[in-house]
């Protein structure tokens, strides 16, 4: 249910080519990183992969994979999930791993939700030192 946030790292300098879409448009905003600590997004994102996400102004305006924090039993918990905004303002929260249930957050259930950014890439980390 939870994903590890080895804290959200500060913005990183990156080669422009790394985050350019198929139309040649660079991802706007600052790029930040964290490490995936759970299996809820398998097979799309593997545990321990480095996730790069772009500042989205704290809002989910279109479907995608987002990094967000919510209070769980009074403590902040970081989630990396597929989020689909609905016309009524609710958010459908989806794990790609079918062992996890999809759930909906109504507008009144989103007050403790802080959206950190939209995931733009994940990368396998192999350390050599």
Report residues per predicted region:
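Acidic/glycine-rich C-terminal interaction modules and beta/coil loop segments
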Residues: 4-13, 17, 24-129
